[in-house]
Amino acid sequence: MKQILILLTFVSIFSLYSVHLLLKTANEGGSLLYEQLGHKAFGLVGKLAASGSITMQNIGAMSSYLFIVKYELPLVIKALMNIEDTNGLWYLNGDYLVLLVSLVLILPLSLLRNLGYLGYTSGLSLLCMVFFLIVVICKKFEISCPLEVASIISDLVNNTLTRPTAMAFNITDGDSCRPRYFIFNSQTVYAVPILTFSFVCHPAILPIYEELKGRSRRRMMNVSKISFFAMFLMYLLAALFGYLTFYERVESELLHTYSKVLETDILILIVRLAVLVAVTLTVPVVIFPIRGSITHLLCPAKDFSWWRHSLITVSILAFTNLLVIFVPTIRDIFGFIGASAAAMLIFILPSAFYIKLVKKEPMKSVQKIGVSKRS
């Protein structure tokens, strides 16, 4: 548990500090476009690096959200309709459901021209995630440990045929209900890019800053601090209480772990619906920086065109849907994007832009030396 607190703290602090650098660079550089800052700092190479990182990061984020729709929505429909046999039912096929949700819900919201209209949907998605966190905390005091549940035992039947004594011991032994305060293994290392991925909001910072009423860098930093603290607290509490509920039996997909223990729990079903609503309403927000990046890269000097706006939006959604349908798991996407594009957007590009564009501070100043070592 301690390593999660340490990793969350460091990643959130570095991410927030890079937001500070980005806002300061935007003021000094005279641009509120991430790609334009890259162009002013390093020419075409900087512009391509910024645009490529933003596109990769946000497509990865969209893919992760649509993966949740793909795997969770069929289970919700199955539970609501009380269906046992799922063979041949198209509305329980995750691929079809992702396409349907993208076409009916996500595409109309994504076609909106201004980001401000999505503030209400973003607020609703945040409330859904708060509800998810509350349920995770409450279930900690409802589910007893050790987990003596028939569904879990049935999952282990094949293994217990060869090692019945050992497996029975693992289910009932009290040691399995004792938290391990510090664990360092390959999974811990793998968590670093995932946490990095989860704290990337930098492509959306400048568009939000541009539309902020009474815009000032200080006000935007206050908004960022509140947002980062809220996300830090939610991530920490969800991880902590999820682990303290299932200990060694916790899975990477927390809702799946609850489903194995509480197959027909109404509250968990409502949580699934809330999570689905949250991720579905978040996708249009993520599309905005991708579309802006592509538009600025391909046709920066042209006036707004609904035809071009719609074509880019449909192309982004179509590509992401293909990715979700044909890639088997989101874990590889999290790891790859977190280690590449997310690291660029948090650690490298804001620091590089700051060093290059903020001229009033000398290169030998404490802040620039610290930034250069950090990047």
Regions found by a protein language model. Give the residues of each.
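Transmembrane helix interruption/hinge and helix-loop junction motifs
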Residues: 1-2, 113-114, 326-330
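Alpha-helical transmembrane segments and their membrane-interface exit regions
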Residues: 14-18, 129, 342-348
